[in-house]
């Protein structure tokens, strides 16, 4: 017989969750390290009442995404694939060409890959805003600056 009987899943009502807005400056920071810090905040793992099945995380604004850094030779060797869903429609881009065309895409792809797949992951991804430079449209929010490694 199980001696521990008080194990109950925590359910927190959304009206009791206070969502904050965090700003991360990505200039001269490594791509993966910024992405993991953002995912921790988006999922709510920094809060004491974290549960993996609820959206308890905060909103994240990432600025200067075009100034992000990669280690090694990934700048020219890392390849991103996409498909048009037509036969023979596989396209590939290197980090360099993708970041020239859409500077926020590599960071968004990295963060989306770290989030859970399914409806909760899509809901969490909507709490992320990425900007290529330091200008953003969310200055009216009460912003907290987050220092990432």
From Swiss-Prot:
GO terms for molecular function: mRNA binding; structural constituent of ribosome. One of its GO terms (cellular component) is cytosolic large ribosomal subunit. It comes from the Bacteria. The keyword Ribonucleoprotein applies. GO terms for biological process: negative regulation of translation; translation. The keyword Disulfide bond does not apply. Keywords: Ribonucleoprotein, Ribosomal protein. InterPro entries: Ribosomal_uL13 (IPR005822), Ribosomal_uL13_bac-type (IPR005823), Ribosomal_uL13_CS (IPR023563), Ribosomal_uL13_sf (IPR036899). Part of the 50S ribosomal subunit. This protein is one of the early assembly proteins of the 50S ribosomal subunit, although it is not seen to bind rRNA by itself. It is important during the early stages of 50S assembly. PANTHER family: LARGE RIBOSOMAL SUBUNIT PROTEIN UL13M, RIBOSOMAL PROTEIN L13. Belongs to the universal ribosomal protein uL13 family. This is Large ribosomal subunit protein uL13. The lineage of its organism: Bacteria, Pseudomonadati, Spirochaetota, Spirochaetia, Spirochaetales. The gene is rplM.
């Amino acid at each position: 017989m199980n001696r521990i009987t008080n194990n109950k899943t925590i359910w927190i009502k959304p009206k009791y969750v206070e969502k904050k807005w965090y700003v991360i400056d990505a200039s001269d920071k490594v791509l993966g390290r910024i992405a993991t810090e953002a995912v921790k905040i988006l999922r709510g793992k920094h809060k004491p009442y974290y549960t993996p099945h609820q959206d308890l995380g905060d909103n994240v604004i990432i600025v200067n995404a075009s100034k992000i850094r990669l280690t090694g030779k990934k700048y020219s060797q890392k390849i991103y694939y996409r498909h048009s869903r037509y036969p023979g429609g596989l396209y590939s881009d290197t980090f360099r060409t993708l970041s020239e065309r859409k500077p926020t895409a590599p960071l968004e792809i990295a963060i989306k890959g770290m989030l859970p797949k399914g409806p909760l992951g899509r809901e969490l991804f909507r709490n992320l805003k990425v900007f290529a430079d330091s200008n953003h449209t969310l200055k009216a929010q009460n912003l907290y600056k987050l220092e990432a490694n």
